[in-house]
Amino acid sequence: MTDTRQDPIDSLVVADFGRGISRAYLLESISGGFRFVAKAEHRTTTDLPYEDMSQGWYNLLRQLEWSSGRGLTVRDKLAMPQLASGDGVDGLLISASFGEPIRVAILEAGQSAVAGPVLDALRRVHTRVFHASAPSSRKDGGWAATQADALRSFQPEMALLIIGAGAQDAMPRLLQLAKQVGMIGTVSRAIVIADGQAQEQGVAALGNKLKVRSISPVVRAPADIAGEIERELGEGFQIRLRTSDFEVIADDAIQAPISRAHAVDLVNRFIARAFKRQVLTIGVDDGAHAHWASGDQGAISALPQVDLTTAITGLTSREVSDATCWLPFESTEDELVTWALNRSIRPWTIAEQPRDLAIEQALARQVARRAVSEIGRTQPMALAGVDLVIGGPVFARWNQPGAAALALLDSIDIVPNNGVVDLALDPDGLMAVAGVVGTIDPTLASSLFEYDALTHLGSAIVIGGATSPGDVACRGEIHFDNGEMAQFSVLSGSVEVVPLKSGESATIVLRPERKFSIGGHPAGKTVTLAEERRIVGGTVGVIIDARPRTLAGNANRAMQVRQWLESVNGIRASTAVRKQS
C-alpha cells in the first residue's frame, strides 16, 4: 500500500467496489470544508467479458477527470500526491462489497454474555450467519436432525460454539449438531467459547479434522472475544478481496479496504452521537443492511443474501406474495415471481416504466422490512424510538421523493413514540464514503457529511388507531413562519401531505379524534409540535399518515395504494391551503 498521507489532506478519491456496480468519488478541501466534487459510476468488470476489475476502474477515473476538468491519472494510475497545478490527489481510500461473504455458523446453548457482542461483530464484517440455539425442552427431539440438514445446505466455512450458563439440558443436542459440523467438509476452522467441561466436550465433538481453538469467557471479556473474532474475519475478508486485478488498485490505497456496511454503520453512529438522534439507515445495495444507533448504542443487520439485483431470488415466497399489497394495480404472486426471476437474469437493469418502478418499490419494501425486522429482534425497543430514517441510493434512483418517503415509512411500519419521524435520503451513497474517510480523519468525514450527504425529504406524523376507512382520524392546522396558516383533515386509511418547503419551519397543532392518538399520547389528546419539536420542511413536505399498520389487503387495496402514491408524489392536491391567519 502507498502511504500518501499529508498534513493536511486536500483531496481524495474514494472508490466503492460492488458486485455489479462500482463508484468513485472525488473529494476536495474547498473554502475550509471537505466537499464532494464529482462522482463516477460504472459496471464492476470482474465478470465476463473482461474478468479484470482494473478495466472498470480506469473507466471510473476517466469519468472523474471529465466531470472535474482536471487530470487525475498518469498511465492509468492515480497521480499522488496532488500537484501544485491541482492535478492528482493526495490519496485513495476503498470500500468494497463484491467478494463472497464468509459463511459462519453459530451454535449456541445456555445463556452467555458473549453471544450478543459476537453477533454484532459478525454483522460489521462481510459475513452470512447461520444461528442455531439448542433448546432445553425434551419435546424438541428432532431439533438436531432438522438443523443438520439446514447446516449442510448453508455450507459454513467457520463454526462458533458458544456454551453458557444453564446449558446442561441443551448440551446433548448441541454436541450432536457439532459432530455434524466436523463432517460437512466445508468448515476449515472452529472456535469453542466455553469454560471447563463444556469447553472440552465442545472441542471433542468437533473432531480432529478441523482447526479448533477454545476461548474461556471466564478469563476474557465478551467484548475482547468478539473483537478477536471480528479481526479474524476482517482478515479473511481482505484475503477474499486479493485477486490480482484488485491488488493492482488496492496497492495505491492509504489503508486496507473496509466493507461498505461497516463504513455506513460508522456514520450512522456518528449521526446519533453528534445530533442526539435515534437514527435508522436502510441500504439495499449488494445485499441489504439496516443500521440503528442511539447515543453510544448501536446495532447492524447485514443480509448479503438478498437485494434487488443478483440476490433478488433471496426473497421468500411469502415476501413476494406480501409485495402485492404495495402495488397500485392488481397483480398476482406468480407475476411478481416472474418479474424477480427476470431481474435476477438482468440484475443491473434500471426500472423506467411506471409498472416496473412500482414493482421494484414494492419488492424494495420487502427487502428492507426483513433487514429492519432483524434490528427489531435484537433491539426490541429500538424502532419505536427512531426519529430519523435514512434511505440509501436505491430509494433515490426512482426520482420520486414522495414514493421514496412512503417506502421508508412502510419499511419501518411503526407508530413512533413521539409520533414524528424525519425522513432523508443518501442519494449519492456518501454515507459509505464519509465512513471510509472517517477511518483516517474524522474531521474531514464530519465536514463531508454535514455539507453534502443527505437530502431531507420531510417529516412524517404517524397517527395510531383505526376505524372504518373514510372516517376523520385527525384535524389540524399548520402555522408558518411568515404568518400564514392552513387547516387540514386526514381520513382513516389515508395519507395527507401538507406543503412545507426545504428551509421552512412551522408549528403544527394536531387534534386527533377520540379513537386516534399521536405517538405515545392518550387517544384524542391535542398535540402541538412547536419550539424544539418544530417541524422542518423538505422535498416532499409534511406527511400525515393515518394508514393502518398492517399488510392485510382488501378488495380496494390497489386503489388505496394508488391514492397514497398520488398524495405523496403531488398528483393529488392537498386539502391544506395556505392563507393569512
What is the predicted function of each stretch?
Residues Q63-S85, L151, G182-T186, I271-A272, ...:
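Phosphate/pyrophosphate-binding loops at sites that engage ATP/ADP/AMP, CoA/4′-phosphopantetheine
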Residues D3-G32, I102-L107, L122, A148-G166, ...:
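Gly/Thr-rich phosphate-binding beta-strand-loop-beta motif of the actin/hexokinase/Hsp70
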Residues A40-S68, S136-W143, G166-A167, G314-T316:
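N-terminal phosphate-binding loop and adjacent alpha-helix
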Residues R19-D52, R124-R128, G298-T313:
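Short glycine-rich, Thr/Ser-proximal phosphate-binding strand/loop in the N-terminal lobe
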Residues R75-A115, F395-N399:
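Short beta-strand-loop/turn "lid" adjacent to the catalytic site in phosphate-handling enzymes
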Residues V192-G227:
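Terminal amphipathic helices with adjacent charged low-complexity linkers/tails
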